[in-house]
Amino acid sequence: MSETVTIYLDDRAIEAPKGMNLVDACKLHGVDIPVFCYHPKMEPVGMCRMCLIELGFEQRDRTTGEVVLGEDGKPLVRWFPTLQTACTQVVSEGMHVRTTTEAVRRGRKDIIEFILTSHPLDCPVCDKGGECPLQELTMDFGPGKSRFLYDEKIHLAKRYPLGEQIYLDRERCIQCARCIRYVEEITDDPVLQFYERGRRLQIISTSEPGFDSKFSGNTTDICPVGALTTADFRFGARPWELDSAASICTHCPVGCNLTLNTRLDRDAGGRVIIKRVMPRQNEQVNEIWICDKGRFGHHFTAAPDRITTPLVRKGGKLVEATWSEALELVAGMLKSAGKAVGALAGPTLSNEDLWALRRLVEGQRGARLGVWPPTMTGGDLIAEVGVAQGTNFTDMGKGACIVVVASDLEEEAPIYWHRVKVAADRGATLVVVNGRATKLDRYTRHRVRYHYGDEVATLNGLLRQALGDAAPDIDGFDQLRAALENAPAVDAAAAQAIAGATDLVVIVGGEGLSMAAHGALMQAAANLLVATGHVGRPNNGLLAVWPGANTQGALDMGFTPEDATHIIDNAASFEALIIAGADPADEDPRAAAALQEAGFIVATALFLTPTAELADVVLPRMSFAERDGTFTNGERRVQRFCKAIDRVGESRADWQIFQQVGAALGQGRAMPTPGVVMAQIVERVPWYAGMDYPTLAEVAPQFPMVGGEDLYYGGTMYKNAGGLGRQWAVAAEQASYQARVRVPKAPAAPKPGKGELIVVPVRLLYDQGTEFYKTQLVHRRVPQAYVALNAGDAARLSVREGARVRVRLAGTEVEVAARVRASVPEGVALLPLNLGVGPLPHAASVGTVAVAEAVGA
Amino acid sequence: MIGDMVRGLVTTIKHVIQRPVTIEYPEVRRPVQPRFKGRHWLHRYENGLEKCIGCSLCAAACPVEAIWVEAEVNTDDERYSPGERYAKTYEINYLRCIFCGYCEDACPTEAITMGHMYELSLYVARRRDLHQG
């Protein structure tokens, strides 16, 4: 894109990148061309006609190709006789554009007047009123008065639910098709369509349930009128009444930048509550998008069943206590526990919380710092060959290759999926390596299937094929070559794609993998990158789809999943356990029993979870919206989030709690603010050098330039003023890096016997996670607990669609409904986690599925 | 000397025979000008539904931020206004209100007007509010 062309914008010569859309190019040089249907993230269609301009080209002599000069020595310009749409033009050398002439002004005025003939102008009751592109452009360019008779306006449905989450107002729609194009072109959920024609042209949803997309909320942002609004924010407040705070999503490792819009609410007892969640532009993380889980899953912050005071176990029951009483008790118990102290840190603890917790435990000479859930590992490999600084899916196109292993990205990290899919549209080669079909398969020819348990062998096979006879001079390669001898041939075309890629990113999930198996898979993925030389450069490296929003931060702060397993396995040897923001008893079948064995348990929690119920002291922690802190996302970008609402009850931030306990134990004074804790992290954790709060809050110009004065360009979005965060550099980026490969040691694959299946627990986006399920709005999207079977297996087991079946795996038995799906491979049963049937193991294992009645008989 | 006394009382005597300018408030109340801006009123349609749609434009226009509006969705079971939206909460803080009447101007449905009532110091109500609980 370094090549530029010169165009003349209002008789001023400007340079614009070759191939850029004319609207974007003008925007880049400070000239706003009004648009409704054009959106910088989508292909232009030229439907709304709002972007009219005068367009001309320099005349060229047909024989010589030379520019024809006029008498004054300037090139002669041949202007189009009529106005042209700017959005359908791509800048080219010698293009002349006029945006301020009378004809252009007139054209825009007429288009606005025409659009308004079918618009109800009910701005006072419209949720978009105040931040509405149509409103703004009418004020700027409109006629001020309509010649159209009010009674002749078309009247259509005003409150039409496209799904439970999105309402459509058919009168307000101006048929720009941004929403339809978004779901068709970008998220590939073709669930919206136009219906009828002429003035009755209207949008319908063709799916059941309605508007079945995980990104439906984004259409309300890009809608240039109030036609699409969310049920969540329906009449929540007028936009100008809202306060906003920069935040980070806590639902998955992508770390989408959010803006929390808050306002006081009498129904909430006069408290300030979160009214809506909006994406905050960060082109390196989430661009301008967020998924519906992030957008609607904020209600847990204001849930009525939040713990509001410390609880202390007295006579077998948890009773309310004061902070001083509870902290004194905790400090006393930690003191008497001596070294036998362990900590489990949950997925949404901030870096400051984790650091304070580590200091507390280490201050007592405890050594076990576990990160929950212990399903994935390989933090050391990320620190070695993780995606390099400056990696951005937006920059990946032709020549780049993205390998996705053992992950259903759309369910686990929707915005990764979104960006990978769009990169594939741009020409990046996608290799999907999975045991089953996922939605990502649609965008690639390279679908590599493995039998569950053969993940590592499959990657080894790909590496062997990709390398061919090449023998890179890398430490440990000879041993690896010997180990690769036996690797199976997998998919020559996919291996070719990997070998021929200029950039390579490997995204590793943990579907169906035990922690040990995941560690081996991470090593195999790292080998693939190192052996093909794709480390230490932007757009190259390893990316793990961690189970939690701040799992990466926990790994950076010295917490490990191995310690978490150790703590659960040897709970009895711990006299005191600190479980911070984690719920092992609800997620791991072994944990509930194991925790009973442990000595004193102190839990910090938002709700009285099964783990909190086992604790001796429960301390109310603040949610992410009530305090400041930093999270580190999957790409190792450290990002700040800010306080948006007041604390609930007497809750305190985790870092505060641990510091106060530490102070009571004589570990030194408690630090006053999270910024000070961060300063200590900056000092002690080398990766975080230079990442103090002001640095993390720095912003830089981004393209497309959404927000600010021109809501019509990118949609309803505001400028990111909260910071872009900083990504830390991995070892492979350092000059001293010694490339190294190691032989991955995969545990044996599960071998089902006769009548047995491999039961694979899978993660769903919409589940009954404690925090997410507090949002009533999404309940209908969360399925009943089920197990998905292949038609052949279902027939063999005489299981029909919808039948109640008992699934047995690894010592756990659950009763769920059966689903028969062609996408499930033979011999495999997919069992979604977290659907309210109690804790399930995370790793695939041999199990059985049987009709429930048959078991009882 | 009498002459001096009369001269001294001239003004007093003049006022004795003049009609008094004071009125016996609260027994007697002087009418206000038709466009007097007193206490606000929120109006209803003839069928009893509220004219207010909770659009909060009055609050936006208010120069002293005296108005607080929260909107909610009407349902068929619980209907306050004809359209979809109504004001769940409507509060005017009279300690702040400067009776400028901008709210009236901003209202798209003529739901809020300023009436003639100016007796806003309600001793009993105030006392109750202050001392209850």
Where are these regions (language model features)?
Chain A
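Acidic/polar loop patches that form or flank catalytic/metal-binding clefts of enzymes
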Residues: 228-234, 268-276, 343, 368-371, ...
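N-terminal export/assembly segments and adjacent metallocofactor-ligating motifs
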Residues: 2-19, 24-27, 35, 39, ...
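A glycine-rich, hydrophobic/aromatic-adjacent loop/helix-cap motif
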Residues: 499-571
